């Protein structure tokens, strides 16, 4: 009997440990909205995260967004970590030691290649500058918008031909001078 009690006590201890471990690791749960964002920020830390998996990752499941996976289905830690961005250091390791071996770059190495004397770019630029000098936008010369141009021209002509009903003088009338009788003492 004593051995049976020890085995039973050992089984109860193991069962308690197993239940505690399952609760600690947790089963998959659903996360939505702010809870999902907070959890992603906690899991990913400074790396940041994506709402859809980046291209090139090992996709076991069909590429769904994290909202569909975690809000409508169950979500666990491993799944959350697949949506974390890669750290900057792992993508490109530019430590001070690796930069020491690089030669100094000067401005001449970044100059644009020179265009030919009569390249298409120069012809296009000359045509556009000629259009601007003539002050006629290309949209008004287009056949499709010609009716709009004619309407604008008619409106301008109507404004030029409009005459006001009353013509106001361009100068103010002279101020009336006060007569000496009006300015004298009044009794």
Swiss-Prot record:
It holds the Pfam family IGF2_C. It is found in: Secreted. The record marks 47, 57, 60-61 as: Important for interaction with integrin. Residues 162-187 are annotated as: Disordered. InterPro entries: IGF2, IGF2_C, Insulin-like, Insulin-like_growth_factor, Insulin-like_sf, Insulin_CS, Insulin_family. The keyword Disulfide bond applies. This is Insulin-like growth factor 2. It comes from Gallus gallus (Chicken). The lineage of its organism: Eukaryota, Metazoa, Chordata, Craniata, Vertebrata.
């Amino acid at each position: 009997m004593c051995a049976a009690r020890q085995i039973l006590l050992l089984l109860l201890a193991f069962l308690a440990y197993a239940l505690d471990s399952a609760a600690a690791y947790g089963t998959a749960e659903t996360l939505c909205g702010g809870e999902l964002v907070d959890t992603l920020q906690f899991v990913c830390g400074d790396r940041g995260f994506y709402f859809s998996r980046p291209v090139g990752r090992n996709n076991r499941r069909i590429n769904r967004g994290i909202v569909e996976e975690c809000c409508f289905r169950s979500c666990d830690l491993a799944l959350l970590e697949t949506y974390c961005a890669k750290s900057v250091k792992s993508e490109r390791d530019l430590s001070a030691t690796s930069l020491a071996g690089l030669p100094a770059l000067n401005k001449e190495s970044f100059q644009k290649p020179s265009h030919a004397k009569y390249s298409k770019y120069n012809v296009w630029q000359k045509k556009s500058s000629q259009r601007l000098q003539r002050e006629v936008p290309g949209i008004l010369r287009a056949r499709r918008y010609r009716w709009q141009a004619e309407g604008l021209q008619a409106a301008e002509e109507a404004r030029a031909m409009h005459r006001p009903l009353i013509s106001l003088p361009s100068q103010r009338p002279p101020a009336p001078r006060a007569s000496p009788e009006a300015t004298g003492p009044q009794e």
